[in-house]
Every structure is written in C-alpha cells, then in structure tokens.
C-alpha cells in the first residue's frame, strides 16, 4: 500500500522515513534539543549535559548532523582555536517538533514528568506563544 502511494506521487521514499533516518540516531535529538532550548554551541557543553554520550559518539553525531545540513561547524580564530556549532534553517525547524514532543509527554506521561503525577497543559507549564529557548535560558 505504501509503495503504491509513493509510486503514485513520484516519490522515491517515504518523507517520514527520511526524517526519521535524519534524526533517529541515538543522541541526535538530544543535541538538537540542547542547541534549540539551551542555546548550547560547543562540544564540551554537549558532552557535559547529555547523559551517556561519549566523545566518540558526540563527534560522529555532530559530523552526521553537519552532513545532513542541520548544523554548521564554525572555527573561531582564537588561541586556542575554538569550534562552535550553529543551527541551519533546516535545524531550526525542529523547535516546533520538540515542542510537540514536550506536549505529548506533559499530557500523556505526567507520572514520569511531574512529581505529583498530575497531567497539565503544556502551555500552562511553559507559557503561551513563548519560544522554548526563553524558558531554558540561564
């Protein structure tokens, strides 16, 4: 059925499968979350805040994300040289997706999310029409 649908519309692959392939590797969404929500830009920041990620895996994921066009690697000419990562327009499109993932958990997994286990509306917790990054800024 899916194959027929793809063929009908001249598609080579399912766009959802393609997106899952792009961000579905372990820690990729965590890196995007930290870039979008925490405004993190440096390797050491990711390494210190993503539980369980190794330097090797982080390096691999950042390279993959750069190849996918989600981030750009910027070399800052200081001594010592610093590397920062920036979201591309493509990478920035994940903010509403992350917000939807947050809404899902707040609504359907309150026992895991909240100490009292009571469901809440996402906007009641994080505010309406507020970019998530403003909630997470230090």
Regions found by a protein language model. Name each.
Residues 1-11, 72, 89-90, 95-138:
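C-terminal regulatory/oligomerization modules of transcriptional regulators
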Residues 44, 63, 83:
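Residues within the helices of the helix-turn-helix
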Residues 58, 62-65:
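Basic amphipathic alpha-helical segments that dock to polyanions
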Residues 66-86:
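Beta-hairpin "wing" of winged helix-turn-helix
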């Amino acid at each position: 059925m899916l194959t027929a649908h793809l063929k009908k519309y001249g598609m080579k692959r399912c766009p959802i499968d393609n997106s899952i392939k792009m961000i579905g590797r372990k820690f990729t969404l965590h890196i995007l979350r930290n870039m979008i929500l925490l405004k993190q830009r440096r390797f050491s920041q990711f390494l210190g805040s993503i539980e369980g990620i190794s330097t090797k895996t982080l390096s691999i994921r950042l390279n993959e994300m750069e190849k996918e066009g989600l981030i750009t690697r910027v070399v800052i000419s200081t001594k010592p040289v610093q590397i920062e990562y920036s979201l591309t327009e493509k990478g920035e499109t994940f903010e509403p997706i992350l917000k939807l993932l947050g809404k899902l958990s707040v609504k359907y997994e309150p026992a895991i999310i909240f100490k009292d286990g009571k469901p809440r509306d996402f906007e009641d917790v994080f505010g309406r029409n507020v970019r998530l990054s403003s909630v997470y800024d230090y």
